[in-house]
Amino acid sequence: MNSPIRYFGGKNGMAKKILKYFPKEGSYNTYIEPFGGSFGVALHNPNIPPIEIYNDLDNNVYSLFKTLVDKEMFEEFQKLSDLIIYSEKVRKAFKQDLKEIPFNEDDKLSIVHRAFKFFYVNRTSRNGIGGFSINTCIRRNMSKSCSDMLSTIEGLPKLHDRLSKVIVTNQDGIKLINKYSQREDVFIYADPPYHQSTRTETRYNIDMNDEEQERFIDDCVNAKCKILISGYDCDAYKRLEENGFIKIKFVVHTMSGDHKTKKDKVECLWMNYKTELEDVDN
């Protein structure tokens, strides 16, 4: 099952590869994503543990997933989705609303409307964050852009069923790791913002500076729970390997933002538990 949103740094396309390195089924009963984002890896996992916790500090992303798990909120969200039109003008207005309207966690209707506007802006933007997306390819006798959005809307009921038992929170991801890291029945998949030393620009609404990355690494190194981390290789993360984490590298084929240039990137995984797979790069 694919994520309902496109997300910078999201792992939809790598999910099956990453899942190969998950701990054995039954070796944990609580699964946590402290930097939830698109939740792309978990949505591809056929082995669902008893407890799943999705967390994201971004109010827009949190609002969407909070709405998707709640029965009443989802029903209202679906009503809005059924009336949708694919419009650059609507996208511009919704984007402005997301900037100007204060986040109110105590107002369910407000969260639903924020969730819908974020969903709309995301699905009508190139790669979820660029300009208005117009794809001239034809699918189902319409623009591929419209077809993709309608397909996502049609899949929302199944997505709601899948997410209905997920616990959704809106807090600092590092604090969440710290809260659960000493429990041996917990497995944390951490996909934090790429370290700033590995990129030239900021595309995250909620980023992490070098000090926060150090705190994140501290908590991971001292954890008793199972942890799997994904990201780009960098000097700061060498401390993970120095403290017993296994590192795995694999090449990811991506397209540039304009969909014209192919790029190969090397993604890394770090884990503090043993894996049966042999392609381990120490």
Predicted regions and their residues:
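Short beta-strand element of Class I
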Residues: 50-55
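Residues lining hydrophobic/aromatic ligand-binding pockets adjacent to catalytic sites
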Residues: 28, 146, 171, 175, ...
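Long, positively charged, glycine-interspersed low-complexity recognition regions
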Residues: 206-282
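Conserved SAM/SAH-binding beta-strand->alpha-helix loop
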Residues: 58
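Short, polar loop motifs at secondary-structure junctions
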Residues: 36-40, 154-156, 231-235, 274
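S-adenosyl-L-methionine
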Residues: 1-35, 40-41, 47, 260
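SAM-dependent nucleic-acid methyltransferase catalytic core
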Residues: 1-17, 24, 70-189, 193-201
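Short alpha-helix immediately C-terminal to the canonical SAM-binding loop
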Residues: 62
